């Protein structure tokens, strides 16, 4: 449960969740439902989701968009809005985000602006979305000049994290999601990091108990922080380890060239080395982080053709910038992160040059 007063909502985690009778709250008989999904997920899972919704008596339409970060933009928002208007969806309609982080972000954003706000349900189908993006109410689309620059805070009515979806997840997407798991461990829980070092192969093999532990632990951390700081005034920024460097890489390369977790992986390494130059992170901790990321199969170095100037120009549009001052989330040691302001450009240049 995410306790946010009037915006409190349940988070269901497990297998075979779709068979639970009240799992699709607040959907009931005659509710107008629009399933927002992509062409890949639609082929595999839509029939099953629709079956259970029809059993409830819901009126269901599908809005199918192309798969990929490149489609997370205002044009896609227009397509979804036009569909809702075409079929006269009312303010008591419910949207379902059936997909990964891209689908969840777009659907939440549409829900926040359609007729000044309607309800939506998150059904994340990727590991990355299950451990991070589906919880907390951040919604957004990208702009050509920056990732997630157009968005809002709009909490879902419920989140359904069903492990069964991971059985059909492409390997690259699975590996990308593990980057966010590593982020949580490095940022908040050294015991979790130690556990990952010992049990990584079980996670990669989709061992049920290992996945359950990882997903539950990440969600516990995320929920505890969101409950304290829903709108990212301070504490919630700590969830952004690796994202300043990572978002810059994604924007430079073009959305979708690298998956989000791949960029975050490099961002975690760069943030760790930035902290080391500031006198905090120890070399042994950085070695352990790099070793774990390499075992996962994630990149640890940025694009060779990305210049220092390209990083800096993207940093200036980072959402953590306040009054022109860049704030970065950096690890102090494994299990602890802090926000640093105005890291000197010479340090940033050294990190970028050597990563």
From Swiss-Prot:
Entry note: cofactor: Binds 1 divalent metal cation per subunit. Can use either Co(2+) or Zn(2+).
Entry keywords, A to Z: Amino-acid biosynthesis, Aromatic amino acid biosynthesis, Cobalt, Cytoplasm, Lyase, Metal-binding, NAD, Nucleotide-binding, Zinc
GO biological process, one term: aromatic amino acid family biosynthetic process
Residues annotated for Zn(2+) binding in this entry: 180, 243, 260
Gene3D superfamilies xrefs: 3.40.50.1970, Dehydroquinate synthase-like - alpha domain
Transmembrane regions listed in the UniProt entry: none
Family annotation (Pfam families): DHQ_synthase, DHQS_C
UniProt function note: Catalyzes the conversion of 3-deoxy-D-arabino-heptulosonate 7-phosphate (DAHP) to dehydroquinate (DHQ).
HAMAP family: DHQ_synthase
Protein name per its UniProtKB record: 3-dehydroquinate synthase
Species of origin: Buchnera aphidicola subsp. Baizongia pistaciae (strain Bp)
Gene designation per UniProt: aroB
